[in-house]
A protein has these predicted regions:
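Short catalytic/metal-binding and nucleic-acid-binding patches
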Residues: 1-169
Length: 169
């Protein structure tokens, strides 16, 4: 089956990546730190603006805007770099897949779409029962967006029905 991705220059893209078999590998902080390190290293090769992110035990969400490249190049480079370094750090020499084969993407269409996906990202740790308040999840851009005035502490403390129903995973 051929999978078609749509590339629209200067567009922000919502991306979901999932660990193979949903193994909660990001429950270990050293893997989260490797994720951040390898994502930063990827930005040395490919230019992009990262608007928002969250890393959960078995998946991650990003809102990013490629600059002069496409998001598939960014994700391919990141996932390969991450897997190679994970294998090296863990003494794995055999064939090994850290990630599910593909990632999911959605091109953001307008400000409302951006805000919906931003909320989804920041509410996701609550939705999955990792924490009861978004600010308690440290592997997220939520507090940076609080500082920017997009949220007030208290947002997400009560159940947000429309976000509970959404599933981009």
């Amino acid at each position: 089956m051929n999978y078609r991705r749509y590339y629209i220059p200067n567009s922000t893209v919502f991306i979901v990546g999932v660990t193979r078999n949903r193994i909660p590998r990001f429950s270990h902080q050293e893997n989260v730190e490797l994720f951040k390190e390898m994502f930063d290293a990827t930005s040395d090769k490919y230019r992009f603006e990262l608007s928002a992110s969250v890393i959960l035990p078995d998946h991650f969400h990003l809102l990013l805007k490629p600059v002069g490249c496409n998001f598939s190049e960014i994700m391919l480079s990141f996932k390969k770099r991450f897997t190679d370094n994970f294998k090296k750090r863990n003494g794995i020499s055999a064939n090994f897949s850290f990630w599910q084969g593909r990632f999911w993407d959605h091109v953001i269409r307008n400000e409302g779409d951006f805000k919906s996906h931003l909320d989804y990202i920041h509410y996701n740790p609550v939705k999955h029962g990792c924490v009861s308040k978004p600010e308690d999840w440290h592997n997220s851009s939520y507090l940076a967006w609080v500082e920017r005035g997009a949220y007030s502490i208290g947002w997400g403390h009560t159940r947000i029905e429309e976000l509970e129903k959404l599933s981009f995973e």
